[in-house]
Amino acid sequence: MADTEKNLVIFDTDPGIDDAMALLFLKAQPSLKLAAVTTVFGNAETEVTTRNALYLTQRFGIDVPVYAGATRPLTIERGPAPAFIHGEDGLGDVGATQSFAVRPAEGHAADRMVEIIKANPGRVTILAVAPLTNLALALDRDPGIASLVKDVVIMGGAFAWGGRRGNATPVAEANVHNDPHAADRVFTADWPVTAIGLDVTSHCVATHDDAAQLASGGEAGRFLWDISRGYEDLYRRRNQVDGCCLHDVAAAAYLVAPELFALRSGAVRVVTEGIAIGQSIQKLDGHIFGPSAWDGHSSKLVAGEADYAGIVEAYKTAIRSLG
């Protein structure tokens, strides 16, 4: 397939173990072309996530510019990075990026996002698997990009459609909770958004045996095995899961296999203060209430359920194909 026929993707990310899984999944997709990798705080500080993105793209031969982005939320204070999940270095503390030092491409992620979208109207999908600060900043820089983007696909939110609520708090998913004001800005902008939240991603489990089989199949699988030993152990202890959830991979899978997802349509708002800060709430189309904060905002799509086994199989097929 010629590059001009491929779907262009800006991957907004905070690598992150499952971010690394998603990036390698994207590399394996012949119908996609990465236009940029943009980084943000989240699983680690922006300096660390940027280094990790540069390391991953160089190690696995992914020819794409990496642009560093926001280092803190729009309004609230930055919370501590979850080193207990992803390690101090964001990639499992196995020493993968030790002594690695490469500078990102020039320019702020939000500015480059705007430029790429304006240069390719109707062709660019933003895949955001991190706090949504870069996207909110891009909208502030040029609101006109909302009418030019093809789609915005988010790994974020917890809407309770699948019985799952938060992982950062009892009601808030981590990416949205890290910058709730940015998330509300993104969900209320007049552009297409599809959210693949914990309702789906927490059911997409690559088992220990899946990871072991991929590790025996080539460098990509072995690398993912190495960085995810502590990650997998955390899932076992905290969630009683034999393996780990493919949060970011599930959102990436939507780009190439949307038929695996059942979507619900309706306006989405995010709580930006109080005990429920970071909670994402969808008002379904056709449900009639009195005047509310959802009024006047365009509908967004939220995944309520999916073919979980199909998503896991797509991931395994992708990683095996990389050798």
What is each PLM-predicted segment?
Residues 80-87, 166-170, 211:
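Short, surface-exposed amphipathic charged segments that create phosphate/polyanion-binding patches used
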Residues 66, 186, 252:
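A residue-level signal for conserved active-site and pocket-lining positions in enzyme catalytic cores
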Residues 2-6, 25-26, 33-34, 174-177, ...:
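Conformational coupling and interaction surfaces
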Residues 7, 50-119, 297-310, 316-320:
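Metal-dependent C-N hydrolase catalytic cores
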Residues 3-13, 17-55, 95-201:
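Active-site histidine-anchored catalytic micro-motif
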Residues 77-79, 163-165, 206-208:
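Short, well-ordered secondary-structure micro-motifs
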Residues 44-45, 74-77, 204-205:
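Short secondary-structure boundary/hinge segments and terminal tails
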Residues 21-23, 48-49, 77-79, 281-283, ...:
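Short, glycine/acidic-enriched capping/hinge loops at junctions between secondary-structure elements
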